[in-house]
């Protein structure tokens, strides 16, 4: 007997499952009876934000998802884009925020495991990873523990699995004190004629369980990921999954071998809501029913209930619909890799989701209403209140610009991330061309191919809070610029939208306007969103995180030998600014970090100018005019120049244009701007090309000496810059 299904369904139990009273009434109307305890858990898992996107789906539909290179957009395990020669890139970014705060090592590790499965489920071998991490104030007592655990968890899983980490972000702000963000990105390469989908087809076909055994870890994980935190965090620790990267590696190899056999009809990884979600999604997408027998599920713990088996989020598991004539050969492959292969059910034609356990039917529900017809809300929202423009003349000028620059370089958010990325294997697989620490990571498509892929992920949360619309646009354009600085053509993006409680109209307004900004930018730049993730309820005791819509993008280089980096400049190169001189100090780190001014609107994003300047930069890189390129973002011109000096270990001498106040020209964060180190013989050709294309270009100076010398108002040696840039993170992590 399933004793768990004898549990009385009370209002308290319904609330514990995160279901509103109107949602429960909808369930009663839908099935015409009271649900069993297991069914209640299934509805709770499938109708929460993490699985259903019920608060955001209306707005996600406005994103541009089509493009000339797009093979598969949102709705599958990951997005797919064509890169030519019969190959495609499969990629996605996904959050594991709540679990990583509760149990940082396992939360981050299993976040990596989940996104890796999303990619190789579709037939792609993972080739690159990134992560975007947001932590609380460095002064908060938990921050150092969380940083250490998350970084170790990501490295422990991705290094053992064998995928290089090529880029990412790490930022600190007190608004993440109670809710850190762990956004993980993975890209893989597949054959365009061998992509595997999750849509079940055919009646009476075997449904097969693949991979590791099912335990009690992660039960209720999807529900936990859709709730606010309070002071009872430790009680949620059992909802965090435990991962094993070595089993995942075996699962990858077994799945790819099985795919070569052409035995798979549909395949889905078991992620949020585990077996429930994978079975329901496969059936609902294919307009088929699914029948499961839980007695056939491999379990690693005794006396597991139907509720626990259905909602476990144990890692390294897949569900597949198999061609029956190939089941013996398929089973042999998984046996060879030491993994479980168990036929646990079949597809049906009745659009019902039926589950039996110990001879008893414990679930009998309509599958479409559970899956792709789950409730969708049009939540009330209010338009964000915008800050007035802050003129540079209104911002105090600090006389010692050298001290300002050194303070920024030695700050939590502008210092080197070497301490982080040196814990990741950045070179495994042998195709990494540009490692973390620059604008974008770059890998070769393969060791005998001239093509390369570039990756970047970006967002500026302080911009998004001041103006979610402009902040959403800026997240896209910075990612697009970073890819462009390598010479790669940006092809497509994935989003990871991290926000607070959508039931708060102010928070919902942030989400709505950020999506509007992202949509407009992606449309103008031909940079479609092909996959993504929404993480809501990132609040603790009513304190919401900064709105953080992370954008990760992929670009393509036809010839990797033409790749340029932030640190490639040579002596006697000309330093050239593409775009306007700095003037905008609103929401700049100069205003916030140096003057403690949280005022002004963020910089306006001119999308046509972004497109024009990005195309020009890629063109001059392809023509071989440029030794180094860097986009200008946080910290403006001064910080960008300092980073180039540090990476190249070469000095720069420049003069300011004096078109703006000096502090604005140095630290203004105007957009659509790049610094290029131009080869001496190519300078005139580049200037002529800029004139023909009506590109704003300013000659600033040259690569020379052993210091960063700006108009004699700032003169800092390479050693001094490097020491300040590299010292903050190790000192922070080694504090006793």
Curated annotation (Swiss-Prot):
A single cellular component GO annotation: cytoplasm
Documented EC number(s): 6.3.5.3
Gene Ontology molecular-function annotations: ATP binding; magnesium ion binding; phosphoribosylformylglycinamidine synthase activity
Keywords: ATP-binding, Cytoplasm, Ligase, Magnesium, Metal-binding, Nucleotide-binding, Purine biosynthesis
Primary location class: cytoplasm
The protein's annotated pathway: Purine metabolism; IMP biosynthesis via de novo pathway; 5-amino-1-(5-phospho-D-ribosyl)imidazole from N(2)-formyl-N(1)-(5-phospho-D-ribosyl)glycinamide: step 1/2
The name this protein goes by in its record: Phosphoribosylformylglycinamidine synthase subunit PurL
Gene: purL
């Amino acid at each position: 007997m399933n004793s768990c299904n004898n549990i009385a369904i009370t209002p308290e139990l319904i609330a514990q499952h995160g279901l509103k009273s109107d949602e429960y009434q909808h369930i009663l109307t839908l099935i015409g009876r009271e649900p069993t305890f297991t069914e209640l858990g299934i509805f709770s898992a499938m109708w929460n934000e993490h699985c259903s996107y019920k608060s955001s789906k209306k707005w996600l539909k406005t994103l541009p998802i089509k493009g000339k290179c797009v093979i598969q957009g949102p709705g599958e395990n990951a997005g797919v884009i064509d890169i030519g020669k019969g190959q495609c890139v499969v990629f996605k970014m996904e959050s594991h925020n709540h679990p990583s705060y509760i149990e940082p090592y396992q939360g981050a590790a299993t976040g990596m495991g989940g996104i890796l499965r999303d990619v190789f489920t579709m037939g792609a071998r993972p080739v690159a990873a990134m992560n975007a991490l947001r932590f609380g104030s460095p002064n908060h007592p938990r921050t150092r523990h969380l940083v250490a655990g998350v970084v170790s968890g990501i490295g422990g899983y991705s290094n053992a699995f064998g995928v290089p980490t090529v880029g990412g972000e790490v930022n600190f702000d007190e608004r993440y004190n109670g809710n850190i963000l762990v956004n993980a990105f993975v890209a893989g390469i597949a054959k365009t004629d061998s992509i595997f989908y999750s849509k079940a087809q055919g009646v009476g076909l075997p449904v097969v369980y693949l991979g590791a055994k099912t335990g009690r870890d992660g039960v209720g994980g999807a529900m936990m990921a859709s709730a606010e935190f309070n002071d009872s965090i430790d009680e949620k620790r059992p909802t965090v999954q435990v991962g094993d990267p070595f089993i995942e590696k075996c699962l990858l190899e077994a799945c790819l071998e099985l795919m070569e056999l052409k035995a798979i009809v549909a395949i889905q990884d078991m992620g949020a809501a585990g077996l429930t979600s994978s079975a329901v999604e496969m059936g609902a997408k294919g307009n088929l029913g699914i029948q499961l027998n839980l007695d056939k599920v491999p379990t690693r713990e005794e006396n597991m209930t139907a509720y626990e088996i259905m909602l476990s989020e144990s890692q390294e598991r897949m569900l597949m619909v198999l061609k029956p004539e190939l089941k013996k050969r398929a089973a042999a492959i998984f046996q060879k890799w030491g993994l479980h292969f168990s036929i646990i059910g079949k597809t049906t034609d009745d659009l019902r989701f039926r589950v039996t356990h110990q001879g008893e039917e414990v679930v009998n529900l309509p599958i479409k209403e559970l899956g792709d017809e789950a409730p969708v809300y049009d939540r009330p929202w209010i338009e964000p209140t915008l800050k007035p423009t802050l003129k540079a003349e209104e911002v105090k000028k600090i006389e010692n610009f050298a001290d300002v620059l050194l303070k920024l370089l030695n700050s939590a958010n502008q210092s080197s991330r070497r301490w982080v990325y040196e814990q990741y294997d950045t070179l495994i697989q042998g195709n990494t061309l540009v490692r973390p620490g620059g604008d974008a990571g770059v890998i070769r498509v393969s060791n005998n191919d001239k093509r390369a892929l570039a990756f970047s992920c970006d967002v500026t949360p302080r911009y998004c809070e001041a103006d979610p619309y402009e902040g959403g646009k800026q997240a896209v354009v910075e990612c697009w610029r970073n890819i462009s600085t390598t010479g790669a053509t940006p092809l497509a993006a994935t989003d990871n939208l991290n926000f607070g409680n959508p039931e708060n109209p102010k928070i919902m307004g942030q989400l709505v306007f950020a999506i509007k900004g992202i949509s407009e930018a992606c449309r103008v730049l031909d940079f479609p969103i092909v996959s993504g993730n929404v993480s809501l309820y990132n609040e603790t005791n009513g304190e919401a995180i900064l709105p953080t819509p992370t954008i990760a993008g992929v670009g393509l280089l036809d010839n990797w030998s033409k790749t340029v980096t932030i640190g490639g400049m040579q002596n006697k190169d000309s330093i050239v600014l593409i775009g306007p001189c700095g003037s905008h100090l609103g929401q700049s780190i100069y205003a916030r970090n140096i003057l403690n001014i949280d005022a002004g609107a963020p910089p306006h994003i001119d999308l046509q100018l972004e497109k024009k300047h990005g195309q020009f930069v890629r063109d001059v890189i392809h023509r071989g005019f440029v030794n180094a390129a860097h986009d200008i973002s946080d910290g403006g011109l001064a910080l960008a120049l300092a980073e180039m000096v540090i990476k190249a270990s070469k000095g720069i001498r420049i003069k300011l244009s004096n078109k703006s106040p000096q502090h604005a020209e140095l630290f203004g964060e105007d957009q659509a701007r790049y610094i290029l180190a131009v080869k001496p013989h190519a300078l005139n050709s580049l200037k002529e090309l800029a004139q023909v294309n009506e590109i704003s270009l300013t000659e600033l100076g040259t690569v020379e000496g052993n210091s960063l010398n700006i108009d004699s108002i700032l003169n800092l040696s390479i050693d001094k810059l490097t020491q300040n840039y590299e010292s903050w993170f190790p000192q922070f992590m080694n504090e006793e």
